């Protein structure tokens, strides 16, 4: 009845993306980001320090950072810690008391904590649209594309994508920014959405050109990722200015598309703008 303990698996890669029936172009000025149910409770079923979930969180963080930089609204769904039997209704039959048994795990995972200008929607059923103002908020802001990330791919994420489609909102399911009970169920959800209700993409498809054109451009990429109000010098340690490991992993994933040897360890070894520009400005081989 309850969610079982979950095992990590290989996240989908570009060659795993099913044939999309639609070829919708991603339009940032028409899009919104949904971070679906990334609460401690739902993520905890993979255990602590799960590399797969670290990558999923890093990919979501990269998308969120991009959205913040481009004035794309960010929405979260989160189940409440208190849910009456009337509110849960048939969910009790299918999943038992769920999160209500572990109210201390209700918050969104630390590395994706919502900002004050984000919208957190109370989640009551599989679809993020059920008993929520999401459709109205999207349409009032002129948004008709929804980037879907989070857990679980074949339950709430797939249902939300299909519900969005039926409301004339174009869903973009981000294959490597989702997680599921198993790889088979993850891939099933992608196949369904690609063929029935949306477009399936990889994180990298929604992000801009991966390599900054200059050291100044690199600085513009880095500054929004820092917690400190003071700007670092080019040789300052960026970790001292609040750059965390999740954002560093996301940067490594983006830059590795051009320089295949770049990884988290390489960036963390010398986390300065000078050192990173030296890595990025190398001739591509």
From Swiss-Prot:
Domain Carrier: 209-284
Phenotypic consequence of gene deletion: Cells lacking this gene are hypersensitive to the antimicrobial peptide wrwycr.
Regulation acting on activity, per entry: Inhibited by 3-[(carboxyethenyl)oxy]-6-hydroxy-1-benzoic acid and 3-[(carboxyethenyl)oxy]benzoic acid.
Keyword Cell membrane: no
One Pfam family from the record: PP-binding
A single BP term in Gene Ontology: enterobactin biosynthetic process
Positions annotated to bind Mg(2+): 227, 242, 244
Names of required cofactors: Mg(2+)
Summary of pH dependence: Optimum pH is between 6.5 and 7.5. At pH 5.5, EntB retains 50% of isochorismatase activity.
Keyword tags: Cytoplasm, Enterobactin biosynthesis, Hydrolase, Ligase, Magnesium, Metal-binding, Multifunctional enzyme, Phosphopantetheine, Phosphoprotein
Name by which UniProt lists this protein: Enterobactin synthase component B
Species: Escherichia coli (strain K12)
Organism placement in taxonomy: Bacteria, Pseudomonadati, Pseudomonadota, Gammaproteobacteria, Enterobacterales
Gene: entB
């Amino acid at each position: 009845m309850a969610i079982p303990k979950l095992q990590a698996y290989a996240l989908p890669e570009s060659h795993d993306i099913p044939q999309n029936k639609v070829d919708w172009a991603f339009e940032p000025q028409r899009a919104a980001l949904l971070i679906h149910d990334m609460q401690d409770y739902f993520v905890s079923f993979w255990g602590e320090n799960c590399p797969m979930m670290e990558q999923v969180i890093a990919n979501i963080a990269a998308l969120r950072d991009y959205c913040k930089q481009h004035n794309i609204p960010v929405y979260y769904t989160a189940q409440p810690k208190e849910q009456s039997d009337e509110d849960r209704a048939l969910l009790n039959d299918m999943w038992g008391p769920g999160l209500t048994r572990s109210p201390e795990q209700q918050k969104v995972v630390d590395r994706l904590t919502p900002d004050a200008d984000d919208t957190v929607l109370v989640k009551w059923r599989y679809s993020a649209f059920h008993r929520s103002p999401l459709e109205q908020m999207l349409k009032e802001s002129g948004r008709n594309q929804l980037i879907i990330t989070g857990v679980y791919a074949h339950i709430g994420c797939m249902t939300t994508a299909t519900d969005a489609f039926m409301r004339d909102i174009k869903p973009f399911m981000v294959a490597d920014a989702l997680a599921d009970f198993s790889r088979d169920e993850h891939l099933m959800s992608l196949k369904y959405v690609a063929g029935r209700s949306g477009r399936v993409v990889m994180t990298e498809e929604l992000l801009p050109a991966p390599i900054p054109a200059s050291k100044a451009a690199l600085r513009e990429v880095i500054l929004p990722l820092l917690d400190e109000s003071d700007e670092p010098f080019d040789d300052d340690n960026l970790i001292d200015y609040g750059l965390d490991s999740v954002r560093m992993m996301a940067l490594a994933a983006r830059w590795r598309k051009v320089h295949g040897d770049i990884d988290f360890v390489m960036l963390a070894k010398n986390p300065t703008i000078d050192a990173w520009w030296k890595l990025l400005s190398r001739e591509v081989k």
